[in-house]
């Protein structure tokens, strides 16, 4: 926990990046981690063991060759827009309200904050439900359900969270290219999604050993 907090402080104060604790926490704890950030000073952390090879799968990381330079505003816009939606309901964050609140006030929220902010808020609620499903799938060894939820999560990130490419540089979409190639290579036998905060960097890919050669060749 302390390592993650130190890493976050370094990113926030030294590098000027408005990052949260999720990536740092996952790195410091290791493996698959379910985290509840209700209390950011003392998040609830659960390490969930999973052996991909026992399910006939391998996990790899694909470097999209896109760096994170000049993306601070893109990252900062996500929490800013989500908090704006929450603020309409006099809440500090979206976990204090519900999806129904947003749906019932859709018109005024779209008018005041724009469609992207509303879509990102809807992603937040649905993604939190998916996290519970993902954790349940791993705890009970329902690996196919886990893969399905990962793909759903990636699809939602692309359409609703919109963190695959920077709108300020839409001609460069390396993450989108990598996802398209990965999905084709997997042939519906695995999962892929954007990694971390998105916009650049890497994508994780889970592929079956039965298509290992073809997948690696295509990628």
Could you say what each language-model-derived stretch is?
Residues 29, 55-56, 199:
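Short, well-ordered loop/turn elements at secondary-structure boundaries
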Residues 19, 24, 193-202:
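Conserved phosphate/anionic-ligand binding catalytic regions in large, soluble enzymes, centered on
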């Amino acid at each position: 926990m302390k390592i993650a907090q130190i890493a976050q402080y370094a990113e926030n104060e030294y590098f000027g990046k408005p990052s949260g604790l999720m990536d740092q926490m996952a790195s410091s704890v290791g493996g698959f981690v379910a985290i509840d950030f209700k209390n950011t000073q003392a998040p609830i952390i659960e390490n969930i063991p999973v052996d991909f090879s026992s399910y006939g799968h391998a996990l790899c990381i694909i470097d999209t060759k896109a760096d994170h330079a000049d993306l601070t505003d893109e990252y900062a816009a996500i929490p800013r827009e989500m908090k704006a939606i929450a603020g309409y309901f006099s809440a500090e964050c979206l976990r204090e309200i519900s999806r129904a609140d947003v749906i019932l006030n859709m018109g005024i929220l779209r008018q005041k904050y724009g469609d992207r902010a509303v879509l990102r808020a809807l992603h937040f609620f649905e993604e939190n439900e998916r996290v519970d499903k993902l954790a349940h799938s791993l705890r009970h060894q329902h690996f196919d359900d886990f893969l399905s939820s990962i793909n759903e999560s990636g699809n939602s990130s692309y359409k609703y969270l919109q963190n695959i490419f920077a709108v300020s540089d839409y001609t460069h979409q390396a993450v989108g290219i990598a996802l398209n190639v990965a999905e084709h290579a997997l042939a519906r036998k695995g999962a892929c999604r954007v990694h971390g905060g998105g916009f650049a960097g890497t994508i994780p890919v889970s592929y079956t050993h039965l298509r290992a050669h073809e997948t690696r060749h295509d990628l």
